[in-house]
C-alpha cells in the first residue's frame, strides 16, 4: 500500500512591486496532495528495485500554493524573485470553456532564458511549447504566438500537450515544473521530464503572465484556475522500493546526511551522477591529488551498497569472496570484489571511544595481522589493552601499529585527525582517507570489533571493483565521477570534462586486452640453456619481534668451468628460473627452522640499475652476451635480491649482470632447441609482437609486395611498418590495432565520426564516403545515390550545428559540405574599351601569390604521445589538461579560420562554370554563331585542315615497299614535261625517243636515263660506228637525237633557274628589312618574357614555401618521435617489454614530457602561422577589392608599375594575382614646381596646381607645362588648373623630439621604443637556434621547377643579347647574285623536213583517191575478190559439239 507523509513548511513569497491580483489566495493545495506523490513516484521511477533511499531536491512542497485571480487583461503579470524551482497545476473542478485560460511562465537568465507558454487547446497534442533560447523573452503572449521566435540558438524548442494523452480528463493529475542549475535545466511536462545540460547564469526571477482568471462564479465562489508553487530550498522525501511496491514517506531525521551518503546503485554497478560523494576519497599509493581532474582506475563500480543505520557492540566480518549481498540498496553485481570501502558519517564533534578497537586482516596463509592505534607511546605489554581506530574527529594524535600476536611488526604512522573513510583491498592495501597506510600479503577477510555508538550516526559499506573513470577531486575528496564505460564517456574522459561542447573530438584508443603473442625470429639451429638460480633466505626476529631478512642469505648459480660465481650463456637461447627457500634462526644466525607466521618470506629480484627487469628476461629479450655474477667486477648493472615479508620488502643481496646488446642470444619462456623457425604469427588480429627484436602491439597482415632487401622496415619516426619472412620471402605489414578518428558530438551525443578506414566504429553503422575520408553516422544513408559514394551538400537538407574547415554536421548526424557564399547575377566585365599605350611604356604581367588559409590540422594527442599503449595513457592523465589544451587550441584555431574564410570568399556559379575545363570545352558557353566549328579546349581548329592529310582517291606516290625496291631520283622539271613523258612511255624504255616532249617548240627528254636506256643507246652508238664503213651509220641516229634532246632539256632548265634566282634575290633582299624589324620585336618580347618568368618563379617560390611550411612542421613533429628524451628507448612498448612496470613508468614519463613539449612547440608554431595568415588574408581581400574589382591608383600595390587591371585565380592555400601594369621604358627629367609666386604691384600672391596628380614644370623653352605624373603628356597650363593662395611664404616649425607628441598626439618613435626594449632585455637575451629537418612526405617540391624558370629567364636574357648581335649581322647581309647569261636561239625547220612534207603530200593524195574509188562492194577490188572466192574455196569440216568435262574415279 502506498503512503505519503509530508512535513508542512511555510515559506515566504517574494514578489515584485506589481502584483495585479484583485484577490490573492494563499493556502495549501488541499486534497490535491496526491499530485506530489504522483510526481515523486515518477521522479523515483529510475531507482533500481530493492531501493531504500532519501531523495533531496528542489521538490514541490505542500505549501505555499498561490492562485492569482484578476480581471481579464493581457499586459499584467506576476514577478517572483530568488526562486530555485517553480511548479504549477491547473485546477479542473467546475471549470468550463470560459474558465480555461492561458499561462506564460518566464525564467530569466543569461545568455539563455526559459519560456513555457500554454494555450486554451487542452485537447491538442501541441497545446503548449517550451523554449530555452538566447534573448529577452516577452512577459505576455498572444493566442497564436506558439513559437520561439523571441530567441535564437535555442537549446530546446518543443511543443507538448497540456494534458497527458491529449485528453482534458487527465488534466489536474500531473504537475508542471522547472528546475534550473548552473549547468543544467530540468523540465517536468505532461508526465515526462527533460534534462538539458549547458552552462548558464540564472537570476532566480520568474514572471507569470497571461493568467486571465475569470470572474465568473460557480456555486457562489470564484473558480480556482492556475495554481503555482515557488520553491526556495531543498525538500527531502524517503522512497522505499521493496517487493515491487514503492512507498513515499516524509524524511524526519538526518535527511541531508542520508542524501549525501546513501545512494541507490544503478544497473551495472554505477553510482548515480547526482551523488555528492561525501567522504569518498581517491585511493593512491603515492602523493595525493589536492584538486583537479584525472582519468584513473578506482574502485568505483559498486557490487553492493549496504547502509548501516548505527553501530552495534559486535564483531563483524567482511570477506572478498562469498560475501552475502542480501542487504544491498539498489542493483547487485556478481563481479569480483576488489576493495571494501567503509564510508563513515559523523558530526564534527570529537568521537573518541566510538569506532573499532582493532582491524583484523586475515592474509593469505592463515596469518592474521591487526591494525590498531594508541594515543601515546606504549610498551609491548600494553599493545592490546586500549588500542582503537576512532571513527570521526579525534581529540589528539593516534600512533598506529601492525600487530601479530600482540607484538608490533611495524609502525605505520600517525592517524589523520578525522577518519572519514577506510578502504581495504584484497591485494593487501589498507587505505585511510584515500592514503595507502599499509600494504601486506593478499587479504581474504576483514573483521573488527565495534564499540558502542550513538544511534544518530550511520555508515555505508560498499563492495566495489576497479573501473576506469574520470574523477574530479576538490580538497582531496571526490566530488564527481564520470565512468569511461561508453563511447561518449570515453571522449569525456579523454577530454577531462563531464560536459562536452558541440564539436569534433578525437576518439581515444581503446585498451588492448589480452592478445596473442607473435614472435618473428631468423630460422637457425638453436641450443638452449636453463639457468636455475636458488636463493636461500635467512629470517629472524628483531628485539621488538619484527621479521628481519639476514644479509647472510645466499644466492647459488649453476656451476660453469668449476666456477659458481659467474655464469655466462653459451647457447642461442636461455630461460631463467628462480627458486626460493626460507629458513629462520633465533639469535645465533643458524638458519635451520622453517619460516612460519610473520617470518614467512619470498625472494623477489627487483630491477635495480639494469635497463631491463629480471622477470622480463624470458620475454624474448636479445643479447650478444649475457652473464650473471655474484661479484661486481666487470658488471654493467645489478639486480636487487629482496625478501618480501608481510610487512615490507628487504634487500639482502645483489645479483650482477654482464651483458652486451645484440641478437645472438634470446631469452625464451620454454625450451625450443633444434633446427626451428620459432616464428609465431597471428594474422589479421591485434597481437603483441616481437619482430626481430622490435616490440609493440599491432595487426599483422600478409601483402603481395616483393622487396629484395631488408628484414624489417620502419617509418621516419621509427615505427615498424613491415617485415619479411626470410623463409618464404613474404612481406607482412604491421598496422596499429586501431586508428584515430574524429567523433562529432552534438548535445552530449555522438552523431557521427570521421575515419580513414571503412570499418564500423562507435556503434555507428550508417556510412558514406567523401574524397578524403569515410563518415559514419546515426543518419541512415540508405539512398543508393549517397551510400558508398561521395556525398554532396544537396543530398541532405539540414543546417550544420558544428563545422570544421569546409565540412559540417547536422543534429541528425548528416554530413554536409559547406560551400562559400554564392553571389547572384551573371558575370560581367568591369569595363571595356581600347587602351592606347604610349611608345615609352610597355605592358608587363606580374604574378603575385598571397596565402589565404592554412590546412587545418587535428592531432590525436594521446595517440602521438603514447601510440595506443594503455599504461602510457594512464600516465598521460596525470598531466591533467595538457592534451585537451593542445587539441582545443588547434580545433578553435581551425574553426576561427574557417569562419573567416567562409565570410571572405564568394563564388559565382557562372564564373565557376567558365573556369571548368569541361565546361570551357563545350561550345554551349560560346557565341551560338560559332557552334558549327570544331572546338577543343577553347581553340578553333578550322585551320588544321590545311596541314592534315586529305582523303585523295588518286594515288600519286609510291608505297614504302616500292621505295625499297626502286631507286628514287628527284630532279627539277620543266612544266608538265616529266608527267607527259611518263604517261607516254608507260614504263617501256624502247619508247623513250618516240615519247620525246616539246617545251616552247624545242624537243626535250628528261635528263635522267636509267641503265636500260643507257644500254640501248650505247648499242646504237657502237653499231653505228661498226657499220659506218658499210653504210650502216644510220644506226646511231637515235643516240644522237636522244643526246641532243636531253641537252635541250638542260639548257631550258638553266633558263628557268636563272629567272627563279632573280625572283629569289629580289624577294630575299626585300625580306631582310622585315626580318630585322621582326627580330627587334622578338628581342623586346623575349626581354619582357624573361622578366615575366622571373616574377612567376618568385610567386611559385612563395607557393612552395606556404605549402611546405606546414609539412615541415609536421615532419619536425614526426622526427621528435625518434628522440628518446633520455629514456632507454623511444618505443614505449619496448620499454615495458624490458622493464618492470614501476621502472618503465619513469622512462615513459620522460617520453611523455618530451613529446608534449614537441606538441606544444608545434601548436605554438601553428597558431603563429595562423595569425600571419589572418593578416595575409586581409591583404588578399584588399587586393581583390582594389586590384581586381577596380583600378588601383597606388603605385606598386597592384604590381610594380601603373596598374591597368588584375586577374585572380585559386592557388594552393591561397590566391595568385596576375597584375597587368605599365612599365616605363624611357624617362623624361623635368624640374617640378610646387607653385608660382606672382607679383601685382605691391601685392604678392601664389598659384598652386589644383589637381595633385599633375606636375607643373618649366621646359627648356622657358614655358610652363602640366603633365600627369603617371605618363609624360605635357600640355600648356590654363587658369582653371590653378588655385590662388594668399602668399608665397613657406613656414617651417622648429621642434625637438620631446615636442612632437604635443604637435602629433599619436606619434611614436618606433626605433627608440625597440631600442629601449632591447636595452632592457639584452643581458638575458639570446638568439634561439632552430633546426629544421627535411620533410619527405606530402612535400611540394618546386625547387627544380623554380630553378628551371630562373634558368630559362637568364637564358632568355642571354638570347636577347645574342639576337641583338644577329640583327646587326642580318643588316649587313645582302644577297648579290651573279646573273647567268640568257642566250636566245631561233631554231628553223631543216630542209629534210620540207622534203618529207612534200613526199607525204604527193603520196597521200593518190592514195586517198584510190581508196574512195576502188573500195566498197561495187568497187574494182570488191569484184575481183568475189571471183577468187569461188575458185579457191576449200572443204569445210563438220562442227563438233563441245566436249563436256568427265570425272574419272
UniProtKB/Swiss-Prot annotation:
What Gene Ontology biological process does one annotation of this record name? fusion of virus membrane with host endosome membrane
Region Heptad repeat 2 (HR2): start and end of each range? 1305-1402
Does Coiled coil show up as a keyword for this record?
yes
Q: What does this protein do?
A: S1 region attaches the virion to the cell membrane by interacting with host ANPEP/aminopeptidase N, initiating the infection. Binding to the receptor probably induces conformational changes in the S glycoprotein unmasking the fusion peptide of S2 region and activating membranes fusion. S2 region belongs to the class I viral fusion protein. Under the current model, the protein has at least 3 conformational states: pre-fusion native state, pre-hairpin intermediate state, and post-fusion hairpin state.
- Report residue spans for region: S1: 17-776, 29-776
Membrane topology per the entry is:
Single-pass type I membrane protein
Stretches for region S2: 777-1449
Q: Which family does it belong to?
A: Belongs to the alphacoronaviruses spike protein family.
What residue ranges carry the coiled-coil annotation? 1104-1148, 1338-1380
Q: Where is this region: Interaction with host ANPEP?
A: 657-801
Motif KxHxx at which residues?
1445-1449
Record PROSITE patterns: COV_S2_HR1, COV_S2_HR2
Annotated signal sequence range: 1-28
- Name of the protein described by the UniProt record: Spike glycoprotein
Top-rank taxon, per record:
Viruses
Question: TM spans, by residue?
Answer: 1391-1410
Amino acid at each position: 500500500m502506498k503512503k505519503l507523509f509530508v512535513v508542512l513548511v511555510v515559506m515566504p513569497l517574494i514578489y515584485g512591486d506589481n502584483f495585479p491580483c484583485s484577490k490573492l489566495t494563499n493556502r495549501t493545495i488541499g486534497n490535491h496532495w496526491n499530485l506530489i506523490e504522483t510526481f515523486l513516484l515518477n521522479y523515483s521511477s529510475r531507482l533500481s528495485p530493492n531501493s531504500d533511499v532519501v531523495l533531496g531536491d528542489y521538490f514541490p512542497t505542500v505549501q505555499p500554493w498561490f492562485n492569482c485571480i484578476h480581471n481579464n487583461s493581457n499586459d499584467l503579470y506576476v514577478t517572483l524573485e530568488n526562486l530555485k524551482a517553480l511548479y504549477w497545476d491547473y485546477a479542473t473542478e467546475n471549470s468550463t470553456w470560459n474558465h480555461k485560460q492561458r499561462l506564460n511562465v518566464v525564467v530569466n537568465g543569461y545568455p539563455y532564458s526559459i519560456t513555457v507558454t500554454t494555450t486554451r487547446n487542452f485537447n491538442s497534442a501541441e497545446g503548449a511549447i517550451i523554449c530555452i533560447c538566447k534573448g529577452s523573452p516577452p512577459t505576455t503572449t498572444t493566442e497564436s504566438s506558439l513559437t520561439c521566435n523571441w530567441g535564437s540558438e535555442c537549446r530546446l524548442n518543443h511543443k507538448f500537450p497540456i494534458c497527458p494523452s491529449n485528453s482534458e480528463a487527465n488534466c489536474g493529475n500531473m504537475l508542471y515544473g522547472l528546475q534550473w542549475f548552473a549547468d543544467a535545466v530540468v523540465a517536468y511536462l505532461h508526465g515526462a521530464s527533460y534534462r538539458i545540460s549547458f552552462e548558464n547564469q540564472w537570476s532566480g526571477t520568474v514572471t507569470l503572465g497571461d493568467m486571465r482568471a475569470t470572474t465568473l462564479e460557480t456555486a457562489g465562489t470564484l473558480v480556482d484556475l492556475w495554481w503555482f508553487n515557488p520553491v526556495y530550498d531543498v525538500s527531502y522525501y524517503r522512497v522505499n522500493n521493496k517487493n515491487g511496491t514503492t512507498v513515499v514517506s516524509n524524511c524526519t531525521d538526518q535527511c541531508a546526511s542520508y542524501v549525501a551518503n546513501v545512494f541507490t546503485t544503478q544497473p551495472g554497478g554505477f553510482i548515480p551522477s547526482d551523488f555528492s560523494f561525501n567522504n569518498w576519497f581517491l585511493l593512491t599509493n603515492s602523493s595525493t591529488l589536492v584538486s583537479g581532474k584525472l582519468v584513473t582506475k578506482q574502485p568505483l563500480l559498486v557490487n553492493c551498497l549496504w547502509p548501516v543505520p548505527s553501530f552495534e557492540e559486535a564483531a563483524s566480518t567482511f570477506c572478498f569472496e562469498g560475501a552475502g549481498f542480501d542487504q544491498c540498496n539498489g542493483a547487485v553485481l556478481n563481479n569480483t570484489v576488489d576493495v571494501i570501502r567503509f564510508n563513515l558519517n559523523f558530526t564534527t564533534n570529537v568521537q573518541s571511544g566510538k569506532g573499532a578497537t582493532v582491524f583484523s586482516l586475515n592474509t593469505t596463509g592463515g596469518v592474521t595481522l591487526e591494525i590498531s592505534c594508541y594515543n601515546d607511546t606504549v610498551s609491548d605489554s600494553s599493545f592490546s589493552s586500549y588500542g582503537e581506530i576512532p571513527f570521526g574527529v579525534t581529540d589528539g594524535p593516534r600512533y598506529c601499529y601492525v600487530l601479530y600476536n600482540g607484538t608490533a611488526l611495524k609502525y605505520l604512522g600517525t592517524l589523520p585527525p578525522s577518519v572519514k573513510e577506510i578502504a581495504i583491498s584484497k591485494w593487501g592495501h589498507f587505505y585511510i582517507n584515500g592514503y595507502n597506510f599499509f600494504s601486506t600479503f593478499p587479504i581474504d577477510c576483514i573483521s573488527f570489533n565495534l564499540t558502542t555508538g550513538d544511534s544518530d550516526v550511520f555508515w555505508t559499506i560498499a563492495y566495489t571493483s576497479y573501473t576506469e573513470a574520470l574523477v574530479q577531486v576538490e580538497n582531496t575528496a571526490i566530488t564527481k565521477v564520470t565512468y569511461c564505460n561508453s563511447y561518449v564517456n570515453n571522449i569525456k574522459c579523454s577530454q577531462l570534462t563531464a560536459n562536452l561542447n558541440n564539436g569534433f573530438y578525437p576518439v581515444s584508443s581503446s585498451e588492448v586486452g589480452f592478445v596473442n603473442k607473435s614472435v618473428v625470429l631468423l630460422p637457425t639451429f638453436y641450443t638452449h640453456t636453463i639457468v636455475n638460480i636458488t636463493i636461500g633466505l635467512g629470517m629472524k626476529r628483531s628485539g621488538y619481534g619484527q621479521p628481519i631478512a639476514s644479509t647472510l642469505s645466499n644466492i647459488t648459480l649453476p656451476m660453469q668451468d668449476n666456477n659458481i660465481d659467474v655464469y655466462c650463456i653459451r647457447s642461442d637461447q636461455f630461460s631463467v628460473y628462480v627458486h626460493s627457500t626460507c629458513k629462520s634462526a633465533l639469535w645465533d644466525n643458524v638458519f635451520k627452522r622453517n619460516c612460519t607466521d610473520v617470518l614467512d618470506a619470498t625472494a623477489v629480484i627487483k630491477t635495480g640499475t639494469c635497463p631491463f627487469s629480471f622477470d622480463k628476461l624470458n620475454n624474448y629479450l636479445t643479447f650478444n652476451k649475457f652473464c650473471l655474477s655474484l661479484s661486481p667486477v666487470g658488471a654493467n648493472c645489478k639486480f636487487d635480491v629482496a625478501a618480501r615479508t608481510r610487512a615490507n620488502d628487504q634487500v639482502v643481496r645483489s645479483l650482477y649482470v654482464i651483458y652486451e646488446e645484440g641478437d645472438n642470444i634470446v631469452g625464451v619462456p620454454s625450451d625450443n632447441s633444434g633446427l626451428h623457425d620459432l616464428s609465431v604469427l597471428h594474422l589479421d588480429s591485434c597481437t603483441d609482437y616481437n619482430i626481430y627484436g622490435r616490440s609493440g602491439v599491432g595487426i599483422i597482415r600478409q601483402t603481395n609486395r616483393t622487396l629484395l632487401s631488408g628484414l624489417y622496415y620502419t617509418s621516419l619516426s621509427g615505427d615498424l611498418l613491415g617485415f619479411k619472412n626470410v623463409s618464404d620471402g613474404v612481406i607482412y605489414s604491421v598496422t596499429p590495432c586501431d586508428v584515430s578518428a574524429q567523433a562529432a558530438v552534438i548535445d552530449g551525443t555522438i552523431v557521427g565520426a570521421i575515419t580513414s578506414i571503412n570499418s564500423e566504429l562507435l556503434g555507428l553503422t550508417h556510412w558514406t564516403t567523401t574524397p578524403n575520408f569515410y563518415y559514419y553516422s546515426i543518419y541512415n544513408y540508405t539512398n543508393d545515390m549517397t551510400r558508398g559514394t561521395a556525398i554532396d551538400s544537396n543530398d541532405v537538407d539540414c543546417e550544420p550545428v558544428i563545422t570544421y574547415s569546409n565540412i559540417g554536421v547536422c543534429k541528425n548526424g548528416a554530413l554536409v559540405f559547406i560551400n562559400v557564399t554564392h553571389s547572384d547575377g551573371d558575370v560581367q566585365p568591369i569595363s571595356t574599351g581600347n587602351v592606347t599605350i604610349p611608345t615609352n611604356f610597355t605592358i608587363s604581367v606580374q604574378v603575385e601569390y598571397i596565402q589565404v588559409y592554412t590546412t587545418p590540422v587535428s592531432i590525436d594527442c594521446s595517440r602521438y604521445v603514447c601510440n595506443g599503449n594503455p599504461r602510457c595513457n594512464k600516465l598521460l592523465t596525470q598531466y591533467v589538461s595538457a592534451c585537451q589544451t593542445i587539441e582545443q587550441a588547434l580545433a578553435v584555431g581551425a574553426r576561427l579560420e574557417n569562419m573567416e574564410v567562409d565570410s571572405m570568399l564568394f563564388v559565382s556559379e557562372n564564373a565557376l562554370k567558365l573556369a571548368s575545363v569541361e565546361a570551357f570545352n563545350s561550345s554551349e558557353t560560346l557565341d551560338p554563331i560559332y557552334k558549327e566549328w570544331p572546338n577543343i579546349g577553347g581553340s578553333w581548329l578550322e585551320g588544321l585542315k590545311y596541314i592534315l592529310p586529305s582523303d585523295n582517291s588518286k594515288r600519286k606516290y609510291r608505297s614504302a615497299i616500292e621505295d625499297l625496291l626502286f631507286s628514287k631520283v628527284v630532279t627539277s622539271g620543266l612544266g608538265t614535261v616529266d608527267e607527259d613523258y611518263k604517261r607516254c612511255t608507260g614504263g617501256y624504255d624502247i619508247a623513250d625517243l618516240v615519247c620525246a616532249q616539246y617545251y616552247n617548240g624545242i624537243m626535250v627528254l628528261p635528263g635522267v636515263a636509267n641503265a636500260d636506256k643507257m644500254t640501248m643507246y650505247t648499242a646504237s652508238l657502237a653499231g653505228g660506228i661498226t657499220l659506218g664503213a658499210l653504210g650502216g651509220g644510220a644506226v646511231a641516229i637515235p643516240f644522237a637525237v636522244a643526246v641532243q634532246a636531253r641537252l635541250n632539256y638542260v639548257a631550258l632548265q638553266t633558263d628557268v633557274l636563272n629567272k627563279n634566282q632573280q625572283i629569289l634575290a629580289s624577294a630575299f633582299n626585300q625580306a631582310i628589312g622585315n626580318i630585322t624589324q621582326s627580330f627587334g620585336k622578338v628581342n623586346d618580347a623575349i626581354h619582357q618574357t624573361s622578366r615575366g618568368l622571373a616574377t612567376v618563379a618568385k610567386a611559385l617560390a612563395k607557393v612552395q614555401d606556404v605549402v611546405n611550411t606546414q609539412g615541415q612542421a609536421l615532419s619536425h613533429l614526426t622526427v621528435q618521435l625518434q628522440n628518446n628524451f633520455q629514456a632507454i628507448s623511444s618505443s614505449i612498448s619496448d620499454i615495458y617489454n624490458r622493464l618492470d612496470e614501476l621502472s618503465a613508468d619513469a622512462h615513459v614519463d620522460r617520453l611523455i614530457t618530451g613529446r608534449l613539449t614537441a606538441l606544444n612547440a608545434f601548436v605554438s608554431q601553428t597558431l603563429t602561422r595562423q595569425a600571419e595568415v589572418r593578416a595575409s588574408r586581409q591583404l588578399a581581400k584588399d587586393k581583390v577589392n582594389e586590384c581586381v574589382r577596380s583600378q588601383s591608383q597606388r603605385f606598386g600595390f597592384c604590381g610594380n608599375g601603373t596598374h591597368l587591371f588584375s586577374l585572380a585565380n585559386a592557388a594552393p592555400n591561397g590566391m595568385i594575382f596576375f597584375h597587368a601594369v605599365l612599365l616605363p621604358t624611357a624617362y623624361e627629367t623635368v624640374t617640378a614646381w610646387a607653385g608660382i609666386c606672382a607679383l601685382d604691384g605691391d601685392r604678392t600672391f601664389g598659384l598652386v596646381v589644383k589637381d595633385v596628380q599633375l606636375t607643373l614644370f618649366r621646359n627648356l623653352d622657358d614655358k610652363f607645362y602640366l603633365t600627369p605624373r603617371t605618363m609624360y603628356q605635357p600640355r600648356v597650363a590654363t587658369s582653371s588648373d590653378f588655385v590662388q593662395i594668399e602668399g608665397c611664404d613657406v613656414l617651417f616649425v622648429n621642434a625637438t623630439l620631446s615636442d612632437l607628441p604635443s604637435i602629433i598626439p599619436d606619434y611614436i618613435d618606433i626605433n627608440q621604443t625597440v631600442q629601449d626594449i632591447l636595452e632592457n632585455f639584452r643581458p638575458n637575451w639570446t638568439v634561439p637556434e632552430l633546426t629544421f629537418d627535411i620533410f619527405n612526405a606530402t612535400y611540394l617540391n618546386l625547387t627544380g621547377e623554380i630553378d628551371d624558370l630562373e634558368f630559362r629567364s637568364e637564358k632568355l636574357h642571354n638570347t636577347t643579347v645574342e639576337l641583338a648581335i644577329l640583327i646587326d649581322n642580318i643588316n649587313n647581309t645582302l644577297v648579290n647574285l651573279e646573273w647567268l647569261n640568257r642566250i636566245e636561239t631561233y631554231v628553223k625547220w631543216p630542209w629534210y623536213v620540207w622534203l618529207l612534207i612534200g613526199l607525204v603530200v604527193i603520196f597521200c593524195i593518190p592514195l586517198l583517191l584510190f581508196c574512195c574509188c576502188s573500195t566498197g562492194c561495187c568497187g574494182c577490188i570488191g569484184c575481183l575478190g568475189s571471183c577468187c572466192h569461188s575458185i579457191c574455196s576449200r572443204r569445210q569440216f563438220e562442227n563438233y559439239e563441245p566436249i563436256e568435262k568427265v570425272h574419272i574415279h
